[in-house]
């Protein structure tokens, strides 16, 4: 190890998912040496099973990527996590519902009577209930199953599920790459209130001090 390497501040940055287009800037900065120029030795890691936010809050990672809606639930609890959002990754919320083309789920009400893969997050489910019922559908008639999916287009093609919440920049583009015909609607197009910043970069509160 050179003396210059020893002078670099070691940073662990935890992703929210497998590496994808939402993380492009992190890897570009690494490849172009921007971290080193800033005096940083950044290790980018994938999240543990219990998530990036917990890893960041525990101090195992100084920074992480997290969805703002998930983060809100982590802060609004009896034991809020010691994390703070410090930057937005995208200017607009590009998340929405991906489904098989022609299944009628190109609008929220089309999810009525269909199967949706859920993380069982309170804000996730409240968002879906709002957009589905507001569009004339019935959220109570949506069949909820656990979301253990890593390849969304493949899962739809195999009829493992009917609808999945994805970021278009990854799930939607991935469907095009895999040539899987899909329908998609953005939450921000259904109601502008859902055009919040997500994902965001979060930091460990003790590290920030």
Residue ranges and their predicted role:
Residues 5-148, 153-158, 162-169, 184-189, ...:
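Short, glycine-/small- and polar/acidic-enriched structural segments
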Residues 32-36, 197-209:
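Extended ligand-binding regions for polar small-molecule ligands
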Residues 180-182:
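N-terminal low-complexity, intrinsically disordered segments
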């Amino acid at each position: 190890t050179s003396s210059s390497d020893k002078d670099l501040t070691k940073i662990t940055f935890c992703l929210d998912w497998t590496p994808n287009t939402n993380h492009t800037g992190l890897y570009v900065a690494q490849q172009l040496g921007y971290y080193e120029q800033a005096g940083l030795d950044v290790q980018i890691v994938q999240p543990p099973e219990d998530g990036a936010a917990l890893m960041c809050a525990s101090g195992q990672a100084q920074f992480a990527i997290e969805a703002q809606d998930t983060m809100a639930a982590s802060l609004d609890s009896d034991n809020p996590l010691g994390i703070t959002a410090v930057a937005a990754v995208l200017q607009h919320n590009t998340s929405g519902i991906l489904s098989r083309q022609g299944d009628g789920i190109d609008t929220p009400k089309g999810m009525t009577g269909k199967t949706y893969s859920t993380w069982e997050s309170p804000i996730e489910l409240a968002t879906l209930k709002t957009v589905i019922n507001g569009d004339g559908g019935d959220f109570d008639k949506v069949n909820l199953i656990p979301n253990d999916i890593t390849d969304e287009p493949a899962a739809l093609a195999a009829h493992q599920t009917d609808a999945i919440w994805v970021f278009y920049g990854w799930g939607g583009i991935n469907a095009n790459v895999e040539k899987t015909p899909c329908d998609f609607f953005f939450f921000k197009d259904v109601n502008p209130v859902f055009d919040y910043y997500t994902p965001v970069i979060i930091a460990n509160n003790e590290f920030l001090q």
